[in-house]
């Protein structure tokens, strides 16, 4: 598991530095362009995130062992696929570095050997990896598995959107491009669902529990985040002189506050039950910081999408115009 965390941390740092470089040095603005090469780094990151959570379940409960192994194979395979897409020149992108066919063939052969060999070993040895027990009731284990399914679904969405133009070109179906509308259509509801189950998993126990018991612990955070989100959105609309209610901003605030409040509730529960040692644990601190970081990311993406205004104008030197009431 430490190796998974190290790999995930370096991949996260690489994506963050790449985004910072593109934003400040190139002046592109925005937060994500769904470029094929950007997607090539996002896919292993999503799978590695799922792998971190599934490995914690395997470590603590001894379950979903085969699933964890499959995620390990998928994470490394998608890393190799990303290298192939960037270095072979099969995809058109401003981030692509090479168009050498020989290098592309070598990377494709290496990808086939590693992926094929891993799946071959798994097919013949996977049956020996037995789980200790199955999930019983509404536990944190079950919720982490659900989040795993959502992360894998997001990876498949990105994979289809990235490779479909390539497959279409190979089959002579014409050159097409898959843009942000496709990814936004699938990613927005999936991310909201991910935030919901993330908050519920933070408030659930590893031991057997039921849905009603978990709901009792999250009912107060749920009421607070709903009331606070509605108030904040109305306040933003009034002070920005824009009286059109933004549902996307409301959903963003609800998701973000839900994550923060359920984390606070989890910390409060541990303090109340005198589990201070767990709070000081590096694993718990890392989880808390990572979830807070994801909440901030959702906040930035959601609000920039809800309140941004773009217009294409023809202007002459010295002329001015008004956008959203500002000159």
Go through each PLM region and give its residues.
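Hydrophobic, small-residue-rich alpha-helical packing segments that form membrane-like cores
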Residues: 1-88, 92-111
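Contiguous transmembrane helix-bundle modules in multi-pass membrane proteins
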Residues: 36-42, 93-323
């Amino acid at each position: 598991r430490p190796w998974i965390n190290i790999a995930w941390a370096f991949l996260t740092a690489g994506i963050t530095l790449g985004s910072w470089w593109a934003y400040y040095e190139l002046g592109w603005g925005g937060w994500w362009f769904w470029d094929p090469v950007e997607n090539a780094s996002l896919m292993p990151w999503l799978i590695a995130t799922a792998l971190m959570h599934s490995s914690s379940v395997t470590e603590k409960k001894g379950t979903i062992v085969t699933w964890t192994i499959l995620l390990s194979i998928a994470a490394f395979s998608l890393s190799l696929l990303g290298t192939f897409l960037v270095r072979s020149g099969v995809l058109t992108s401003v981030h692509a570095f090479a168009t050498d066919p020989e290098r592309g063939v070598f990377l494709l052969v290496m990808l086939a050997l590693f992926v094929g060999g891993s799946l071959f070993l798994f097919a013949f040895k996977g049956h020996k990896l037995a789980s200790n027990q199955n999930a019983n009731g509404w536990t944190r284990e079950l919720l982490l598995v659900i989040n795993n399914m959502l992360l894998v679904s997001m990876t498949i969405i990105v994979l289809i959107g990235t490779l479909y133009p390539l497959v279409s070109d190979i089959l002579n179906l014409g050159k097409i491009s898959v843009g942000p509308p496709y990814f936004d259509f699938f990613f927005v509801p999936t991310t909201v669902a991910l935030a919901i189950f993330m908050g519920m998993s933070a408030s659930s126990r590893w031991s057997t529990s039921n849905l009603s018991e978990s709901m009792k612990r999250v009912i107060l955070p749920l009421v607070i985040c709903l009331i606070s989100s509605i108030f904040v959105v109305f306040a933003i609309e009034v002070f920005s002189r824009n009286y059109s209610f933004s549902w996307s901003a409301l959903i963003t605030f609800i998701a973000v506050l839900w994550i923060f409040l359920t984390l606070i509730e989890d910390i409060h529960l541990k303090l109340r039950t005198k589990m201070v040692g767990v709070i000081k644990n590096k694993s718990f601190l890392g989880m808390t910081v990572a979830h807070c970081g994801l909440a901030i990311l959702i906040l930035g993406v959601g609000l920039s999408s809800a309140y941004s205004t773009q217009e294409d104008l023809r202007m002459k030197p010295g002329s001015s115009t008004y956008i959203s009431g500002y000159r």
